[in-house]
A protein has these predicted regions:
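Conserved Switch II/interswitch segment of TRAFAC-class P-loop GTPases
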Residues: 136-139, 151-195, 207-213, 237
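C-terminal-of-GTPase-core extension/linker across diverse P-loop GTPases
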Residues: 13, 17-86, 91, 183-345
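Short, well-structured alpha-helical interface segments that form or flank functional binding sites
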Residues: 148, 169, 286
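Conserved G1/Walker A P-loop phosphate-binding module
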Residues: 2-165
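Alpha-helical scaffold elements adjacent to nucleotide-binding pockets in ATP/GTP-utilizing enzyme cores
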Residues: 48, 99, 152, 170-177, ...
Length: 345
C-alpha cells in the first residue's frame, strides 16, 4: 500500500478489514475509493479496489436474488438532489412517487408490491429533485442494494403510515434495521464525509385516514428529539379539506428547503439576459462551484464574476427586467438562491 494515503483512508481500510457482512464491506470499500488520493502511485490500488467492489456487488446481487428481490437498473443521479423513499410495505412510497413525478410504479393492495428501485423527477418551481422509490423494508427483507443508494443519496424520506396502529413500532423497526447495517438516519450530518450518517425526514403519510391526527401527535412525540416530521396525504383534495395536514403537492417545496438547494442563473457577458434552467448547488456553495458546473475549466480560468442579488436579481429575472447594479466578486463568494452570475475569464 502506498505510504502517502490520508488518515481517513487508513481508518476506512481498518473498518473494511473489520467488516463482517457483504453490506459493510461494500460500504467500507466505497469509502476507501472516495478517500484514496488520485495520482500515478495509486492507479493500481484504485483499479484493485474497483475490482473488489464489483465482485462484492455481484455477491450481494446474487444474495438478493435468492431472497426474491433484485436491484433493477442502476440509478444514476439526476437533478438538484437525490432523495430515497424508504419504509414499510403499504406505507405509500409508490403513491408519493406517482403523484409527484411522471413515473408509473406498480401500486396494489398486497404487500411488497415494489420489487426494484424506481426513479422519478419531482419539481419545485424550476428545481428538479430526483425521488427514488424502493422495495419495502422489514425484518429479514432489507434489500442489499438499497443501502448503497441510501448512503450515496442527499437524503432519505422515511414514509410512515398514519392509518396503522403499529405506526410507532414501524418507525423503530426501520431505524433499527438501518442501524444494524451501519446506516444512521439523522436530522443533520455532523461530518460531510461520514457515509454512515444520512439525513432523514419522516413523512407521516395518509393524514386523511381515520384516527390519523392522534397517531400523528404520538409519532411527533416519539421522534421529536431525533428527526423532523412532515404530514402528507396523497388524496387528491387533501390539501383543500385539511390544509393543516398537508398535501403531497407541498412536498417538493418542503424538500427544496430541507435540502437547502440554491439556484443560480447565468448571464452571457455583453448579451441580453434570458432566463434559462438554473445551475444548482447546496447552501454554502460558491461562485467557483457554479463555474465548475458550467464548464470544467471555468473554475480555474475565472478572473472575476458580476453578481446580481436580491432586488437587483429579481428585477433582472422579471419579464423585460433590466436589473440593478451588479457586484464584482471572486470565485470564493458564497451564492444565494436566485443569484444571477456573469462569468468573466
Amino acid at each position: 500500500m502506498p505510504t502517502n494515503v490520508t488518515p481517513d483512508y487508513k481508518r476506512a481500510e481498518e473498518a473494511f478489514r473489520a467488516a463482517k457482512t457483504t453490506d459493510e464491506k461494500i460500504a467500507r470499500l466505497e469509502d476507501m475509493i472516495t478517500l484514496l488520493p488520485k495520482h500515478k502511485g495509486t492507479d493500481h490500488l484504485f483499479a484493485d479496489l474497483k475490482r473488489r467492489l464489483a465482485k462484492l456487488k455481484e455477491e450481494a446481487e446474487a444474495g438478493a436474488g435468492r431472497h426474491g428481490g433484485h436491484a433493477g437498473p442502476e440509478i444514476g443521479r439526476e437533478g438538484a438532489a437525490q432523495v430515497v423513499l424508504v419504509g414499510a410495505t403499504g406505507a405509500g412510497k409508490s403513491s408519493i412517487l406517482q403523484r409527484l413525478t411522471h413515473a408509473q410504479p406498480e401500486i396494489g393492495d398486497w404487500p411488497f408490491v415494489t420489487r426494484i428501485l424506481q426513479p422519478g423527477m419531482a419539481h419545485y418551481e424550476d428545481a428538479p429533485i430526483q425521488l427514488v422509490d424502493s422495495p419495502a423494508i422489514a425484518p429479514g427483507t432489507m434489500p442489499v442494494h438499497l443501502l448503497g443508494v441510501v448512503r450515496g443519496s442527499d437524503g432519505v424520506l422515511l414514509v410512515e403510515d398514519l392509518s396503522r396502529d403499529t405506526l410507532l413500532d414501524d418507525f423503530e423497526t426501520a431505524m433499527a434495521l438501518f442501524a444494524e447495517r451501519h446506516v444512521r438516519l439523522v436530522r443533520e450530518r455532523a461530518e460531510p464525509h461520514d457515509r454512515d450518517a444520512v439525513r432523514c425526514l419522516v413523512v407521516a403519510n395518509k393524514t386523511d385516514a381515520p384516527g390519523a391526527a392522534d397517531r400523528l401527535t404520538l409519532l411527533r412525540e416519539l421522534v421529536a428529539d431525533r428527526l423532523e416530521t412532515v404530514p402528507c396525504s396523497c388524496a387528491p383534495d387533501a390539501g383543500e379539506r385539511r390544509p393543516l395536514n398537508g398535501s403531497v403537492a407541498d412536498l417538493p417545496g418542503v424538500l427544496f428547503r430541507w435540502l437547502r438547494i440554491v439556484r443560480v442563473y447565468t448571464r452571457t457577458p455583453g448579451q441580453h439576459f434570458e432566463r434559462t434552467k438554473p445551475f444548482t448547488v447546496f447552501e454554502g456553495g460558491t461562485v467557483g462551484d457554479v463555474c465548475a458546473l458550467v464548464h470544467k475549466d471555468f473554475a480555474e480560468r475565472l478572473r472575476f464574476a458580476r453578481l446580481w442579488r436580491g432586488p437587483a436579481a429579481a428585477a433582472l429575472l422579471a419579464p423585460h427586467g433590466g436589473g440593478g447594479e451588479p457586484l464584482t466578486v471572486s470565485r470564493a463568494e458564497p451564492v444565494h438562491d436566485g443569484d444571477v452570475l456573469e462569468l468573466h475569464l
